[in-house]
Amino acid sequence: MAACSLNLMKSLSPALLFFLAPFLWAEELPPTFLTLRGKELARQDLTTLPALSADKPKGFASGFAGWRFSTVANSGRSGSWNIAEGAFHGMEGPAANHPATASFGLPYQDAVIQVEFRLNDVPLEGRKYRSVFVKATDEKDYVTAFFIGLAGSNLVAYSAERINPANKQRDKEPPVGVPQSLKLGAWYVAVLEIRGQEAVATVAGKSTTTSHPLFAKPKQSVMLGVGVDASFRNLRIWEGMANPEWPKHKEAILAAMKSAKK
């Protein structure tokens, strides 16, 4: 496609090229269903190690702009991060029993959160779950999470009333999910859409949707997480605008989710 576009551009007059160039080089993006992409809020290529925020956070969820993560191997519950093969590489500590996490602080409301990821083919070394996740937080805790593993993906809401006694954080509502057949070492694109009280999560052509009042709260950060070992690149965040086709898309997604349960 790129070679074809280049040959076509060489044959065009400069004046015509000026008007057609935006269309010839238009970026191909994964489809959205709940929303339409609006203003771009953040673009993080993640090909070099991001600078760490100097802000003092309010817990883990808010009070900072930019990135928070650890680069120290076996540093505890947050795991460790570096750049490997041109991507942001997260490693769960074998003794931590907790995903590696990296948070990007920015204020947002309705949004499209998109990131490429790869589950790396490394030994488990006692770690249990090969997975990645994308979470959205409000001022104090998680609002929603998109979990992805080799055999399935699910979308989770968090309770506004119940607290998990083990971690003192909001308890999870029952997840909604679909089976997947992902491969180690392959790159995929995860898309999490949030608008009002609804959310849609999509990977490898399969989507899930759910709703919860907490989704409508102002958001303060995006968290990336890794079970075992995974890499990320090209984190993009846009405003999530209303999609007039959402009722039709919702019906199709719910039907596919129902069919997947059979």
Name each region found by the language model:
Residues G90-N164:
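Secretory/extracellular carbohydrate-interaction modules
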